[in-house]
Amino acid sequence: MSAFGGSGKPDLQPAPASASRLMPAGPPQPALVAQIGTLHLRLPIAQSRVTAVGFQGGSAGALALSPLGTQRNQGVVQRVVHAIVGSSSSGPGWYQLPGGQGPSTSALEVGAAAGTDVYSPVDGTVLSIENIVLNGRIYGSRLDLQPTGAPSLIVSISHIKIDPSLVVGSPVAAGASKLGSIVDFSGAEKQSLARYTNDSGNHVVIEVHPAAAPALG
């Protein structure tokens, strides 16, 4: 999978969510936020709309991602080590969040106000679209993509209202194809990202899972 974007170092700072932030901002500028092997994940939201970026444990089976920025809430030991050996700073600053299952960086959360446009983090094809139902209520959907350059992986994007133009089989382009918009998840759970934003912490979630092995027989 080819890397998307250049070598710029966007400085993303938590920003308040106001009515003006709900106006369409268009696609994000090229910026990589994480990777796993040769697969790079591009920032899915316009930089001016991002409130914070966080990583936490993902759902069952989610794979560990490598953040491409500097952890903003690292401990004293980590700060000393990074001061000596350096750290990755090519991506946006991020926060380690509690909770989830599996590796502590297996879920990427990119915060923005509900209604903010979300774009594809990879080139690929839509594999499935499923509603997220909690306590009998639908809170957006989960979209699974098969990355063009990494067919053995599945990129899952959730906490979004799917764009009606997308169907199973639709091709998507990193940073150019709109997947949908962020849903208001504040009524479903207390969101960890809210600790680092000036709002309820709404966000899009991105995870990477192994693709299911084909059945033999």
Question: Where is each model-derived feature located?
Answer:
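Small beta-barrel nucleic-acid-binding modules, principally OB-folds
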Residues: 100-111, 144-145, 149-163, 208
